[in-house]
Amino acid sequence: MTCTALVLGAGGFIGSHMVRRLKSEGYWVRGVDLKRPEFSSTEADEFIQGDLTDPLFVERILKYTGSTGNFYKQDVPRKYWNPFNEIYQFAADMGGAGFIFTGENDAEIMHNSATINLNILNEQKKLNDLLDHNYTKIFYSSSACMYPAYQQETTEDPKLPEDIAYPAAPDSEYGWEKLFSERLYLTYNR
C-alpha cells in the first residue's frame, strides 16, 4: 500500500520542497495552504487551498479518502475515511521579519498560528477516536525564534539544542507561539 502524507503549508518554501521529497520517495501527497507555491508548480497529487484556522476545513483535510483526490466530494462514506500515515506541519501566520517584529501584528499572528495548531491536533484526535486509530506520525516545524535571544548572538556556535530553550525567553511573540505549539505537540504525543 502507498504511504500517504499531508503537508500543511505546502505553498511555502519548506513545505513545497517537502512535497517534492515525499513524491520522490513514492508517497501520495495532499498539499494544503492559503496560497499555491509561488516559484514553481506543486508536485502534490492533490493541492487544496484553504484556511487552517477554520476547524471544519481542517476536519475535512485530515481525512484521506483515496488516491483519486476526493476532498471536493462532500459525502464520502465513513467507511472510506482513512487517516494519513504522516502529517508535516509547516503552516503558520508569518509575514516575514518586517511584519512580525513591528509589534503591530503580534496578537493576530499568535492567535492565528495557535489556532491552526490547536485545530490540527483537536481534529486529528477526533478522527483517531472515531476510527480507533493512533499511528499517524506528525512532524511540527518550529523556529530558532523560540530560543532566547542571548543564545543567538554569536555565529561561533550555531548549535541550539532543545535544552537551552529554557528558561524561556523567545525574541518575539512569534517565537513564543512556536514554543507554545511545541509544547502542544509534545503533550498531544503523550
For each predicted feature, which ranges?
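N-terminal Rossmann NAD(P)H-binding glycine-rich loop of SDR-like oxidoreductase domains
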Residues: 5-25
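Conserved glycine-rich Rossmann-like NAD(P)H-binding loop of the short-chain dehydrogenase/reductase
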Residues: 27-36
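Rossmann-fold cofactor-recognition segment
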Residues: 43-54
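NAD(P)H-binding glycine-rich loop region in Rossmannoid oxidoreductase-like domains
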Residues: 52-113
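Conserved cofactor-binding/catalytic machinery of classical short-chain dehydrogenase/reductase
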Residues: 54, 116-120, 137, 180-181
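Conserved Rossmann-fold NAD(P)-dependent oxidoreductase catalytic core, especially the SDR/UDP-sugar
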Residues: 89, 118-173
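Glycine-rich NAD(P)-binding loop of the Rossmann-fold in SDR/ketoreductase-type enzymes
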Residues: 108-119, 172, 176-177
